[in-house]
Amino acid sequence: MLEDLRLYQLISPSLPVGSFTYSQGLEWAIEKGWVTNVTELKHWLSNQLMDSLATLELPVLAKLTQLLQQEEWQQAQEWCDFIIANRETKELRLEERQRGLAFSMLLPKLGIELNQTTLPMVKQTQVAAFALAANHWNLTPTKLAAAYAWGWLENAVIVGIKLVPLGQSAGQQLLLEMADVIPQAVEKSQHWPEHLIGSFTPAQVLASSRHESQYTRLFRS
């Protein structure tokens, strides 16, 4: 049970890592009329979940967890570099690094020590932070992947509630419906071939690149 509680803490929206400050392009998509209601938001998020998280973040998270446990530092660093290379806009790269930097300051306070090898990895990507925490707290790969996906989803729905806008009840209903997709994404990630690891979300990439110069915005760029 304690391991599960640690996992809940790791994905909590109250965690001071700035997850709620970025929209990952959704703010621009909403302004331009791509996403105008809860149905379109569900479609937008489902595509990201199945074509990015399930095929990029979650497979890399599993690999990093194993490699860091085995102290295969060079291979682990290569996968951290790979994550950054797949952040296709300046905004997405900045978000990844800023969350990683926040985790680099937070993990030691949670009892997870970082050394001269692991510290640069965590500063580079939050995925490395989750992998280190998983090893420290003996979290199972399936639970870790599901929790990572849930944390991403909850933050994305918060963005939708603020910007579409949606009511709080509609947001909770969307979370309930989208939760059914998370097990599918986790299973897909566990069987995804290594040579195909990557993301294919061109609409999100375009929206993120345009959000960088959006005149009025609530979320960081």
Swiss-Prot record:
The keyword Cytoplasm applies. It comes from the Bacteria. It holds the Pfam family UreF. GO terms for cellular component: cytoplasm. GO terms for molecular function: nickel cation binding. It is found in: Cytoplasm. UreD, UreF and UreG form a complex that acts as a GTP-hydrolysis-dependent molecular chaperone, activating the urease apoprotein by helping to assemble the nickel containing metallocenter of UreC. The UreE protein probably delivers the nickel. Required for maturation of urease via the functional incorporation of the urease nickel metallocenter. This is Urease accessory protein UreF. It comes from Aliivibrio fischeri (strain MJ11). The lineage of its organism: Bacteria, Pseudomonadati, Pseudomonadota, Gammaproteobacteria, Vibrionales.
